From Swiss-Prot:
Active-site residue list: D53, E125
Main enzyme class: hydrolase
Catalysis performed (reactions): Endonucleolytic cleavage to 5'-phosphomonoester
Family indicated by similarity: Belongs to the ribonuclease III family.
Keywords from the named record: Cytoplasm, Endonuclease, Hydrolase, Magnesium, Metal-binding, mRNA processing, Nuclease, RNA-binding, rRNA processing, rRNA-binding, tRNA processing
Organism of provenance: Chloroflexus aggregans (strain MD-66 / DSM 9485)
Subunit architecture: Homodimer.
Record gene name: rnc
HAMAP family, per database record: RNase_III (MF_00104)
Pfam families, sorted: dsrm, Ribonucleas_3_3
Top-rank taxon: Bacteria
Cellular compartment(s): Cytoplasm
Signal sequence coordinates: none
UniProt-recorded name of the protein: Ribonuclease 3
High-level lineage: Bacteria, Bacillati, Chloroflexota, Chloroflexia, Chloroflexales
Amino acid sequence: MVERLAELERALGITFRDRKLLQTALMHRSLFNEQPHLLSNLSDNERLEFLGDSVLHFVTTTWLFQQFPHQNESTLTSWRAALVSTKGLAECAATLNLGQYAFLSRGEDTPKGRQRSKLLADLFEAVIGAIYLDQGLEAARAFIEPFLHERIGTLQTAVLDPTTRLQEIVQSRHKQLPKYYLIDERGPDHQREYVMAVTVEGHEYTGTGPSKKAAKKAAAQAALADIDR
């Protein structure tokens, strides 16, 4: 185990004062479900993940605010949501091969299990939490910001359609997906018109179009227009 942690420290570019924090960051809950006796002197990584999530959001928000002083709130929110999404964090974790260092139950310990996006994202957040506790906010910031610099270019060049932008904003703020549904369908077959609605935090927004997809985009755009105000 000592060599395993030392190897990860080299990959992270960080030497921990309290290496047990790094060890805890790698402890998946499944291990304790399978071997509950371990709980007497070890704990899973969920508390560190919780802390790391908050540190990550703070550092990412501050970095975006400082790097893009003229960008509007809606765009910054979309970028932040993409940067801290499960997919995005899993990609960051994969560059460090975090999955291979995780302590898992026998049921989870498979090549596929170690590469699950949720597992990797949780590990990444837990490691951030461990860095923060061991060495403070500036060390955590120094660890996080290179990943932000690396990934922001892709987000800037990507043209997000309204439904994607709305989904990222709603997920970031409310941890849930927008809900779309068909309200009306009218007109002759050769000139069909659809009316779609989307519900965001109890508010309904509608849009029309020659296809359900177009109407869905229009509804999302209406929601974004209200959110951006």
